[in-house]
Amino acid sequence: MTELPDNTRWQLWIVAFGFFMQSLDTTIVNTALPSMAKSLGESPLHMHMVVVSYVLTVAVMLPASGWLADKIGVRNIFFAAIVLFTLGSLFCALSGTLNQLVLARVLQGVGGAMMVPVGRLTVMKIVPRAQYMAAMTFVTLPGQIGPLLGPALGGVLVEYASWHWIFLINIPVGIVGAMATFMLMPNYIIETRRFDLPGFLLLAIGMAVLTLALDGSKSMGISPWTLAGLAAGGAAAILLYLFHAKKNSGALFSLRLFRTPTFSLGLLGSFAGRIGSGMLPFMTPVFLQIGLGFSPFHAGLMMIPMVLGSMGMKRIVVQIVNRFGYRRVLVATTLGLALVSLLFMSVALLGWYYLLPLVLLLQGMVNSARFSSMNTLTLKDLPDTLASSGNSLLSMIMQLSMSIGVTIAGMLLGMFGQQHIGIDSSATHHVFMYTWLCMAVIIALPAIIFARVPNDTQQNMVISRRKRSL
């Protein structure tokens, strides 16, 4: 890093800043949801749409971000990403209704979807290959700090100011970041293949409509027949994409990806696995505040051990997988995460609050080992010619499954809690207990998929992707 020119180091700082903004926003909002609900006159049971709208938008827009950067230029797209994210933050702070807030989060999600992948692409273009790993480590470090600061910072802002400030703080830093991007970042443009617009639209419609159908009856009052029509339309869009990809060699995601067994199995497991684990960051701060009566700041502090556990486990997960293999690690961590989530609920309802940080630390460790293993299992055997496409599809599936997870969590809360629940009451405890029991079952189910992973304790066990050919 020290051998790089000053202008390149400044460009890396800009990318790191973008990573920090995006990662901070993924965790800072969850702590503020109960306060948002009170301010907007909504039930806390409906506030999951604030999270779903952002994550689903990121999932939909991810496939287009790399192509746009190549076609229009990395500086132009990164600048646009920061501007859209900042404008979305402003509109979030100005929102007076839940629907306005959801629409503003969609705009924020468009910017967030482009920020991280375009940032990675920028590093690839400005840094010599020999220093790429060091540069990526540098720019992703702020992205790891964001989730650590987010819950506590969100709690402080909500408790001592108002929830609007979790969005307003993005505005000055966004302005500085946009100006620095425009002045300092080069605008690399390369020849690229034609964008698969029909495939992109089919996938986008399918993902959005299916998620809406899953949640529409509770939060939007859509009739069952309309929901059935939406579900059928979403499924039809996905099936049409598969037909399109089979006939079109330039499809957004080639079906040749699924000729690699570990990719197919890993992608299915990642999708199912992240539905369950995607519920936890949303449900935990909501339960601590609504179910147990914690203050926003206290609830935010309680999330820090989970992030620390996740960061610490990343240092040893390679050795664990090398020792036990993917199948054993994935099955054990999947079942372990379900048990730890039940342990968290039990400890909380028994009033043993002093044990909650330890349980959340353990939850973060187990979840991190599971995430790392799922990601590398999915990509490790792909041919080099399909590696980039496979990684993009995995990133999209990760965001989609997390949005579905939050949607299901909100749906479960609504089903058990009907319309309104009080803070720290016996009835509220029962609502969260039933919801958590269902969540534990959903978290555990992907173990059935991971049990089909080949026994790899003697081969293909290192978390790295070797060179492959078609």
UniProtKB/Swiss-Prot annotation:
InterPro entries registered for this protein in UniProt: MFS (IPR011701), MFS_dom (IPR020846), MFS_trans_sf (IPR036259), Multi-R_MdtD (IPR023721)
Periplasmic side: 1-11, 70-76, 125-137, 186-196, 246-262, 307-341, 417-430
Annotated GO MF terms: transmembrane transporter activity
GO cellular component, one term: plasma membrane
GO terms classed as biological process: transmembrane transport
Cell compartment(s), UniProt: Cell inner membrane
Cytoplasmic side: 33-48, 98-101, 159-164, 218-224, 284-285, 363-395, 452-470
Topology of the protein relative to the lipid bilayer: Multi-pass membrane protein
Transmembrane segments: 12-32, 49-69, 77-97, 102-124, 138-158, 165-185, 197-217, 225-245, 263-283, 286-306, 342-362, 396-416, 431-451
Keywords for the protein's UniProt record, in alphabetical order: Cell inner membrane, Cell membrane, Membrane, Transmembrane, Transmembrane helix, Transport
Keyword Transmembrane appears in the UniProt entry: yes
HAMAP family: MFS_MdtD
Family: Belongs to the major facilitator superfamily. TCR/Tet family.
PANTHER family (alphabetical): BLR6921 PROTEIN, MAJOR FACILITATOR SUPERFAMILY MULTIDRUG TRANSPORTER MFSC
Protein name: Putative multidrug resistance protein MdtD
Organism encoding this protein: Salmonella typhimurium (strain LT2 / SGSC1412 / ATCC 700720)
